Amino acid sequence: MEVLDRWAEFTPLLQNLQLSALEVVPDVELVAPLTYPRKVICAGANYYGHAEEMGTQRPDPDGEPFFFLKPPTTTVVGPHDDVRLPDRADVDWEVELAVVIGVGGHNIDERAALDHVAGYAVANDLSARGLFPRKDAVLAPFGWDWFQHKAFDGSCPLGPGVVPSWQIDDPQDLTLRLTVNGEIKQEASTADMVITVPRLIAAASRVLTLEPGDIILTGTPAGVGMPRKTFLNAGDLVVTEIDGLGRLENRMVAA
């Protein structure tokens, strides 16, 4: 986190780093690149293909994004960590591009938004579909429980590292992929996003101040399990990857 707090200072050092001169360290176990991000801000319904498969109307590209939050200290786990499945949760998978903020700000101009990005990572926005509807809610309008749906422990595998922003030519031209036990479930391009990365950053910063170390998850493409009523089980191996950013391999285990 200290590097991100001093991102402007470290950027030229990292840009001039000669990767060929670095020594490869064997037998290292990777943990989440940001164990305790300040905020995990998530965009929902942000891919045309995903909206279509969920049976909703076509998203309005001129509309405002929908955001929700994940608790940063208990949901983020590493690229090889096990994830405990809550009971009766019908947990679903969602490969997502994660944007890591390096320069904070409020009311960020969309045209300068990418200047605030430190880098990008791979994320899996695991979702407890079975816990989303609440028939026991105290009042009918509160019958959809985003807290149980998105905030359970370990619901945000992240990593394997943070690829600096200058190494990614275009965040809207990346291929995302997710497999369960070797079977491809999701494969799409970030070009299918409804609201682009710069617009997401600008919109989020109008609501709250973005800080170094904040993570913005940018939505998931088509291929989730919900429309097919197919969910994760204990023992399943979920591989989440984005070309140029790396891959996560997370085993699902019983609660």
Task: Tell what function each PLM region has.
Residues P59-G78, W93, A234-D243:
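Structural signature of FAD isoalloxazine-binding scaffolds in flavoprotein oxidoreductases
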Residues K39-I41, P65-F67, T74-T75, E96-A98, ...:
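Structural motif
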Residues M1-P61, P65, R177, L237-E241:
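N-terminal non-catalytic cap/leader segment that marks the start of a structured domain
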Residues H106-A121:
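N-terminal accessory regions of nucleic-acid-interacting proteins
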Residues E23-E29, P33, H50, R84, ...:
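Catalytic-pocket segment enriched in acidic/His residues
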Residues K70-P72, H80, D87, W93-V103, ...:
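Short, structured patches in soluble enzyme cores that scaffold and shape functional sites
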Residues H50-E52, V77-G78, I108-E110, G130-F132:
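Short helix/loop capping segments that flank catalytic or ligand/cofactor-binding pockets
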Residues Y47-Y48, T73-T74, G104:
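Short, charged/polar surface micro-motifs in flexible loops or helix N-caps
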